[in-house]
Amino acid sequence: MNLHEYQGKQLFAEYGLPVSKGYAVDTPEAAAEACDKIGGTEWVVKAQVHAGGRGKAGGVKLVRSKEDAAAFAQQWLGKRLVTYQTDANGQPVTKILVESCTDIAKELYLGAVVDRSSRRIVFMASTEGGVDIEKIAHDTPEKILKATIDPLVGAQPFQGRDLAFQLGLEGKQVTQFAKIFTGLAKLFQDHDLALLEVNPLVIKADGDLHCLDAKINIDANAMYRQPKLKGFHDPSQDDPREAHAAKFELNYVALEGNIGCMVNGAGLAMGTMDIVNLHGGKPANFLDVGGGATKERVTEAFKIILSDANVAAVLVNIFGGIVRCDMIAEGIIGAVKEVGVKIPVVVRLEGNNAELGAKVLAESGLNIIAATSLTDAAQQVVKAAEGK
């Protein structure tokens, strides 16, 4: 689960980290009032969406009057912000963050992720702040500094000081960085985060360090023990198809192709997407119906897949283990009839009663193509999507 910038900064403040004074507002009038509360003559207004690249898309602006702040809120509230990290529809803006202006001398980067290979939290720091860190890691990996956190003892101040020295910080900045480093590490562990970024972490004109941005992603599997953070969830930022899928315990991720994929098992789903790509097709989604490919789940899966107007054909790849393939085939037939599927559907069944399942599909009289193998299924669905 992603958090908005203002929510991330709220958590930063709770851990004693330096953040700008600001208010999240949802009306133009509240934006103007926020300027009065903050004081000063310059403010930064930011559209709140779960995506990066807001500045280049016009979603971040420096304003010098509360009227301009209100105008910015009027411009964006209720609209959709399109950035390089969103799809063509963009993300809806329901909140504007109004905060004090910061005089920046230098921008740094500080972030943390769970490193699966070492099974540790790993902090990354760089002198190249304010830019896409993935590009820096790809083009100049030597500019990425790392510190691995031992889960038994947690982040240690000496690790923060070591990173600070490597970043070229001096004097009070070293102490400040170490405090920010250990504070972020504690926040990361306390709240079961999957990712945390401060980009940029800035050196102000007076030499002090300041967290100018906050990006936080929480491990969805840990939400059951983070009741406080459940209230931070903003459903307006969810993909409606993914939200629909979650209600039926389906794992769905939208992609940009035209071949819908319905599979039971995450590994098989990824393999299916790979083989579709191998044969020249482009998957429109990742969809794992899980172990129980019942008629109800298959029906909802079809509804979700077909809600994407780009889908020209559907590949159903099911391995029958405990559930027999003939029962799965009957569920697929019932779902196709109920939903009224008009596009070609290619089905590959393997496992328990696979031959009987293929026979049931062949005798259904529906526009369902029974594939003999995974390769055959991929070839058939690519042809069907191309109208051949």
Swiss-Prot record:
Free-text remark on how the cofactor is bound: Binds 1 Mg(2+) ion per subunit.
InterPro entries listed in its UniProt record: ATP-grasp, ATP-grasp_succ-CoA_synth-type, ATP_grasp_subdomain_1, Succ-CoA_synthase_bsu_CS, SUCC_ACL_C, Succ_CoA_ligase-like_bsu, Succinyl-CoA_synth-like
GO cellular component, as recorded: cytosol; succinate-CoA ligase complex
Molecular function GO terms recorded: ATP binding; magnesium ion binding; succinate-CoA ligase (ADP-forming) activity; succinate-CoA ligase (GDP-forming) activity
EC number: 6.2.1.5
Recorded catalytic activity of this chain's protein: succinate + ATP + CoA = succinyl-CoA + ADP + phosphate; GTP + succinate + CoA = succinyl-CoA + GDP + phosphate
UniProt KW keywords: ATP-binding, Ligase, Magnesium, Metal-binding, Nucleotide-binding, Tricarboxylic acid cycle
Domain ATP-grasp: 9-244
Pfam families to which the protein is assigned, alphabetical: ATP-grasp_2, Ligase_CoA
Residues engaged in binding Mg(2+): N199, D213
Name of the top EC class for this enzyme: ligase
A Gene Ontology biological process term: tricarboxylic acid cycle
Binding site for substrate: N264, G321, I322, V323
Cofactor: Mg(2+)
Record-listed ATP binding positions: K46, G53, R54, G55, E99, T102, E107
Pathway the protein contributes to: Carbohydrate metabolism; tricarboxylic acid cycle; succinate from succinyl-CoA (ligase route): step 1/1
HAMAP family: Succ_CoA_beta (MF_00558)
PANTHER family from the UniProt entry: SUCCINATE--COA LIGASE [GDP-FORMING] SUBUNIT BETA, MITOCHONDRIAL, SUCCINYL-COA SYNTHETASE BETA CHAIN
Family: Belongs to the succinate/malate CoA ligase beta subunit family.
Job of this protein: Succinyl-CoA synthetase functions in the citric acid cycle (TCA), coupling the hydrolysis of succinyl-CoA to the synthesis of either ATP or GTP and thus represents the only step of substrate-level phosphorylation in the TCA. The beta subunit provides nucleotide specificity of the enzyme and binds the substrate succinate, while the binding sites for coenzyme A and phosphate are found in the alpha subunit.
Record's subunit section: Heterotetramer of two alpha and two beta subunits.
Name under which the protein is recorded: Succinate--CoA ligase [ADP-forming] subunit beta
